[in-house]
């Protein structure tokens, strides 16, 4: 049986490679893959025709920083201790499905913030095998962290040590010491992780720490990175403090998440070493582009930290904007939008002066490189998966354009689309 042919007529066309929108291009899809692309491409008689001449066609988008294991950001903390692991796995399925409907054909899960298990690997594999529908998942089920750290949600029970101690045991990658973390890396690789995630500093979401607080010592981080590299996998770190970012670079980390308190010296080190950063602008946008009403919607400690670090966040955003750091597009929504509404990050990048092409490239080509799947997706090229999205709103002038996907195809199959609930 011959593979299905699909002929796509593009209005505007962005391939993820060149910083331009081309007009009048066509894409021929054969089965799962892009077969041919060009302005003068003829349509085979047997091909199904999809007319997107009134839309901008792009690669399927990629969100490089998601936490998929909750249903609603308003109740994320309650879900951590009130939902079963089975229910948390269902939330991952739902997030993957909704992300795909929004034009994001691949997502990266940066560790469970409610879940303690490995349900995300089951969902990842089931999607890959075609058993269920959803965005392709690249995942670390758990992050490596220390007691009392940003990754230790038993901070909520710090006033009840007996309960905190019992709950802490459920987090098998939460501990201390070089040998503990060497073993943790080996176990996560054994269980099927796609990469290693560590919590190097405190954060904004957790109640009892600071984003400048060092939460893994140099011996621990060096051991984690070395062990991961020996096993052929990569490491990324949740981190804010410039001194910690510099230390991680010296220890040859592959990339980092957030980096919102960036300074010039640290940015230069990123540039010189080719270390990537997924800056997750949106969670701090209410402080950078000050909006007291939106800040008031966040959890109390998040509000307080945004107010306290507002000036540093503004300065850090500008350092990132003017740098030549390799930047990925990721959302990290736990306190302002639903985790599958990845298009909100586009608004944050555009409002920060990043420009449409820099943002689109981060969400396509660069993200595919960060995730290690650039040979399969991220750009529109013959031989790659037919991961294709289309948008009817103007990507150059409409900051909310990525919240309203008009068409999505993943591996040659067309799926229904769904706009954000917030537009």
Identify the meaning behind each predicted range.
Residues 1-44, 57, 393-399, 413-414:
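N-terminal metal-binding scaffold of metallo-dependent hydrolase/deaminase domains
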Residues 11, 15, 31, 363-365, ...:
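C-terminal cap of metal-dependent C-N hydrolases
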Residues 55-129, 147, 219, 248-251:
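Metal-associated gating/positioning segment near the N- to mid-region
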Residues 68-88, 147-169, 203-217, 273-310, ...:
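Active-site gating loops and adjacent loop-to-helix segments of metal-dependent hydrolytic enzymes
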Residues 75, 120, 150-152, 207, ...:
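Histidine/acidic-residue-rich catalytic or RNA/ligand-binding cores of hydrolases
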Residues 80, 230, 300-301, 310-395, ...:
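His/Asp/Glu-enriched, well-ordered alpha-helical/loop segment
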Residues 93-119, 133-143, 193-206, 234, ...:
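Divalent metal-dependent hydrolysis catalytic cores, especially in the metallo-beta-lactamase
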Residues 125-142, 212-237, 278-282:
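Alpha-helix-loop-beta-strand connector modules within alpha/beta enzyme cores
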């Amino acid at each position: 049986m011959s593979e299905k042919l699909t002929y796509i007529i593009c209005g505007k066309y962005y391939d993820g490679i060149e910083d331009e929108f081309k007009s009048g291009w066509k894409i021929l899809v054969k089965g799962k893959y892009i077969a041919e692309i060009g302005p003068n491409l003829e349509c085979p008689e047997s091909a199904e025709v999809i007319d997107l001449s009134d839309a901008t066609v792009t690669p399927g988008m990629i969100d490089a920083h998601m936490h998929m294991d909750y249903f609603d950001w308003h109740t994320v903390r309650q879900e951590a201790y009130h939902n079963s692991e089975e229910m948390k796995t269902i939330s991952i399925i739902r997030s993957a499905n909704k992300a795909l409907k929004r034009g994001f054909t691949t997502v990266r899960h940066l560790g469970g913030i409610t879940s303690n298990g490995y349900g995300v690997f089951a969902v990842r594999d089931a999607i890959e095998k075609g058993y269920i529908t959803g965005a392709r998942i690249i995942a670390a089920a758990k992050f490596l962290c220390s007691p009392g750290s940003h990754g230790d949600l038993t901070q909520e029970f710090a006033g009840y040590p007996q309960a905190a101690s019992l709950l802490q045991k459920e987090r098998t990658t939460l501990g201390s010491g070089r040998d503990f973390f060497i073993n943790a890396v080996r176990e996560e690789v054994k269980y099927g992780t796609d990469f290693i995630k560590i919590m190097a500093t405190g954060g904004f979401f957790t109640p009892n720490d600071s984003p400048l607080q060092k939460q893994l010592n140099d011996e621990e981080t060096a051991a984690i990175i070395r062990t991961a590299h020996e096993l052929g996998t990569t490491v990324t770190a949740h981190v804010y403090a410039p001194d910690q970012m510099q230390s991680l670079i010296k220890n040859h980390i592959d990339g980092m998440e957030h980096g919102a308190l960036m300074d010039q010296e640290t940015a230069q080190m990123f540039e010189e070493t080719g270390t990537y950063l997924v800056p997750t602008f949106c969670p701090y946008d209410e402080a950078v582009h000050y909006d007291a009403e939106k800040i008031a919607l966040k959890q109390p400690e998040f509000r307080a930290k945004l107010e306290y670090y507002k000036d540093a966040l503004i300065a850090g955003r500008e350092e990132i904007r003017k740098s030549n750091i390799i930047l990925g597009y990721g959302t990290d929504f736990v306190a302002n939008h639903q985790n599958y509404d990845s298009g909100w990050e586009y608004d944050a990048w555009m409002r920060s002066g990043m420009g449409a092409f820099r943002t689109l490239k981060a969400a396509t080509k660069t993200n595919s490189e960060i995730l290690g799947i650039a040979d399969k997706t991220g750009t529109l090229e013959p031989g790659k998966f037919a991961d294709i999205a289309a948008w009817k709103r103007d990507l150059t002038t409409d900051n909310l354009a990525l919240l309203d996907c008009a068409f999505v195809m993943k591996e040659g199959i067309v799926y229904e689309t769904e706009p954000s609930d917030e537009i």
